[in-house]
Design a protein with these regions (language model features):
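Carbohydrate transferase catalytic cores enriched for Leloir-type hexosyltransferases
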Residues: 2-443
């Protein structure tokens, strides 16, 4: 039989070793990785016994005159920029931070490999340039996990723990919690890596930047499952910019072949769907709806721009075997940012059919380019209703969706669809980012 552990006073609990604390934490709060000692105490001890490292670091920084350094994680995008929506966000924010950096902070981009710890890189210049030394924190420094670095956090957990012990704080950008919420939409490997990534965040993070109020609510619910009191970490909703041009390197080469493929679409009107091909994005729903529209005699192209994702064998086969593939059903799987901008310029409208999103960057990018948007009626898309977005029912059948597309198309051509551009750009996003991680101190 297991021995029951009890504590007569809170101070006895506060001084208990981690191995004993793990025996009293509720089983439902345990995850793949045990919480480290400081998080265990935050989960189960009264507040009067806890001190916040971030507060101490800020006080030291203010008193000794040290100019803090912001280390920005670009471990994925610096080695392989696949051009996804998440990577456009990472690139846009990183470039905006570099543009707006002033004398209050040192800004350094960092990367890591399996066998090499986080170190400074000279991004966006050629990979491999930069420092060979691992980064170390001074009090008041901040590590910002801007990139979606699922594996590098696990590989270099010890380095990040030391960064925090040395007086630095750790912040992370969270795009969505979908692999945890809907594992059936993702590969088992992605689900496992995402779960371990969440374990790392629960163990290490001082704060989180979320791309929407929905993502923030989902994250808070996840952290509650770890038993972490909400007073012991911070969250902030970061408004997203919309201008794809601001997410491009100034010297980024243009893919002439990509632009030629896009230009060829201009001969006939088309609707555009942007995003990685994956189950939740609604590509099959659109194909079935357009089958109905084409059967009615509607001569309108449907264009997909996005790379092949996961668990999409049926979708992949449906596209390639479709009678209209290459004619009225077009799939472009390798389009750079310049090509995407041109596609948005030429299209008649953008359809956002995702069943779930953390934010929905293609929607806001389309509005930023003045294009009408028809979106699935889910809460995260309703936030943009005042900008002129039209909606179709979340559970629409192919016929219902076809009807909504046809009505929307007729309204566009009648001049009855008014679109307003979003007000927030990437520079404004960066200002809010710095207010969140520094307590309203300016970049």
């Amino acid at each position: 039989m297991s021995k029951t552990i009890s504590f007569r006073r809170d101070d006895e609990l506060a001084s208990a070793p981690p191995s004993m604390l793990r025996r009293v934490i509720p089983t439902r709060l345990r995850r793949t990785f045990d919480l480290p000692s400081h998080r265990l105490r935050q989960a189960i001890l009264p507040r009067k016994f806890l001190s916040r490292r971030a507060g101490r670091a800020t006080a030291v920084s203010a008193s000794d005159g040290h100019r803090p350094t912001l280390y920005i994680d670009l471990a994925i995008i610096s080695s392989h920029d696949a051009g996804t929506g998440i990577q456009r966000v990472v690139r846009a924010l990183a470039l905006a931070i570099a543009r707006r950096a002033s004398g209050n902070w040192e800004v350094r981009f960092v990367s890591a490999k399996r066998t090499r710890q986080y170190h400074v890189i000279d991004w966006p210049k050629a990979a491999g340039q930069g420092s060979v030394d691992p980064i170390r924190a001074k009090p008041g420094d901040v590590f910002l996990g801007l990139d979606y670095s699922l594996d590098t956090l696990r590989w270099h957990r010890g380095q990040l723990k030391r960064f925090r012990r040395d007086g630095g704080s750790l912040w992370f950008l969270v795009h969505d919690l979908l692999p945890s919420q809907r594992p059936d939409w993702f590969s088992p490997n992605t689900v496992l890596r995402h779960r371990i990534w969440l374990d790392m965040l629960a163990a290490l993070a001082d704060g989180f930047l979320c791309n929407s109020a929905q993502t923030e609510a989902d994250l808070l619910a996840e952290m509650d499952e770890y038993g972490l009191p909400r007073r012991d970490y911070r969250t902030s909703v970061l408004p997203m910019g919309h201008d794809i041009n601001q997410a491009r390197h100034e010297d980024a080469p243009r893919d002439a072949a990509s632009l030629d493929r896009i230009a060829a679409l201009a001969a006939e009107p088309f609707f555009l769907k942007v995003g990685t091909l994956e189950p939740r994005k609604g590509h099959l729903d659109l194909i079935r709806a357009f089958d109905s529209l084409w059967a009615r005699g509607l001569d309108q192209k449907l264009v997909f721009i996005g790379r092949l994702g996961w668990r999409v064998d049926a979708l992949h086969d449906a596209i390639l075997a479709h009678a209209e593939f290459g004619r009225r059903l077009i799939w472009l799987d390798d389009v750079d940012d310049a090509g995407l901008i041109e596609a948005l310029r030429l299209c008649e409208g953008v359809i956002v059919a995702s069943h779930a999103e953390g934010f929905g960057l293609p929607l806001i990018e389309a509005l930023g380019h003045g294009k009408p948007v028809l979106a699935r009626d889910i809460p995260v898309f309703r936030v943009q209703e005042n900008l002129g977005v039209h909606y179709f029912p979340a559970d629409a059948t192919p016929e219902t969706l076809a009807d909504d597309i046809q009505r929307w198309r007729d309204a566009i051509r009648a001049g009855a669809v008014a679109v307003r551009s979003p007000l927030v750009g990437w520079d404004e996003s960066t200002e809010e980012l710095f207010k969140a991680i520094t307590g309203n101190r300016r970049l």
